[in-house]
Amino acid sequence: MTLKKLTLPELLKNSCSKFSKNLSLNFVASGKKTYQDLYNEVVSIANHLLHLGVKKGDKVAILSANMPNWGITQFAIANIGAIAVPVLPGFCSTELQNILEHAEVKVIFVSRLLAKCLEGVKTPFLEHKILINNFSTTDSYTHLRAH
């Protein structure tokens, strides 16, 4: 059997077209999501990243423990051709500063539990901090979800 070579966005879109009503995620805290729900959320977050000025090749960091929104964020970043920079949750502020600056990260998605780690972290590139728990920006708390 020959497998097609697909990008992450193509893989998700194909899965959605074949299995749109099937369950894709099921977590106690966030409930159930079908492939169509997942795809819609990925496209919504991807569109908001574009609205924030993120372009193909820009770096977007993810600082969070495992959660459904981590995967949604990864797919959204890939969907617009940006580069995901996953950051280990155990890093301290100094390490975060170095990683974000060296990678020239433009946007970071951070979990509420780890947001304090970013206090004092400033780089000439970082423009937006977004809470991954509910996809709101930490500076204005404008919700990114189209609910």
Regions found by a protein language model. Name each.
Residues 11, 52, 79-144:
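Structural core segment of the AMP-binding/adenylate-forming
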Residues 4, 13, 21-67, 71-75, ...:
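Conserved AMP-binding/adenylate-forming core of the ANL superfamily
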Residues 20, 68, 86, 145-147:
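Proline-centered helix-kink/hinge sites
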